[in-house]
Amino acid sequence: MEVHHVTEGAETFTCNAFLVIGEETTLVDAGSWDGVVDVIADHTDDLDRVVLTHQHGDHVEQLEAVVEAFDPEVYAHSHHELRDHDISDGDTVQIGDEEFEVVYTPGHADDHVSFVSESTLFSGDVVVHDDGAFEYGSFGRTDMPGQSREQLIESIEDILERMPADVEHMYAGHGGIFHGDVRDVVETALERAEKREPKYPEE
C-alpha cells in the first residue's frame, strides 16, 4: 500500500494526514496545515475520498480546502456539513486498495473511529506509537471536556479484539509511523491507559 504522510513537513500544529494511493485514492484526515492541498497535488490529481477518524480541529480544519480542490466523497461517523457518507461501527470502507473495517473508538472524542484491515491500522488519536508522553505505545489524552479514560480503555480493547494478528503497519493521528508488531504497541498502550494515571503531569 502506497502511503504518503501529507503533513510531515508542517511547521504548525496539525494531526498526521495520510494520502493512500490506489484504486480508491483516499486521504485519512485532512489536518490543519494550509499546505495539505499542495502536497496532495504533488502526488495525484484524483482524490476519490476523505475518511475522518474524528472531527477535532487539527483533523478537519483543511477539509473544506481539500473538498474544493479535489471534490472527493467525505466519510465520517458524525454529522459534518461536507459529509457524503455516514460510517458506523462494523461498516467497511475501501482505503487505497484495501478494505478496512470501521471500529467505533470513543474516549478521546465521542465521534472517533479507527480503521483496520488485514495489514494496517489507522488508529487516529486512540493509540499512537510515540508522542510527547511515551516513546512506545501511547494513547490519546482524556483530560478535556467530553473525553473519558474508561471509554478509551474499552476502545483499545475493541481494537485488539478485532485486529487481525498479522497487522504490521500503524498510522496514528500523532507521533511516528510504526512498522512491525502493531499488536504489541496497542497492548502496551492499553497497559498504560489501564493504570489510570495522568498522561501528562498537568492532567
Features from the language model and the residues they span:
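Structural detector of well-ordered beta-strand residues that form the stable sheet scaffold
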Residues: 27, 75, 170-171
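Conserved beta-strand hairpin/beta-sheet module of binuclear metal-dependent hydrolase folds
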Residues: 1-40, 113-130
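Terminal disorder- and signal-encoded targeting elements
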Residues: 1-2, 200-203
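Metallo-beta-lactamase
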Residues: 33, 110-193, 197
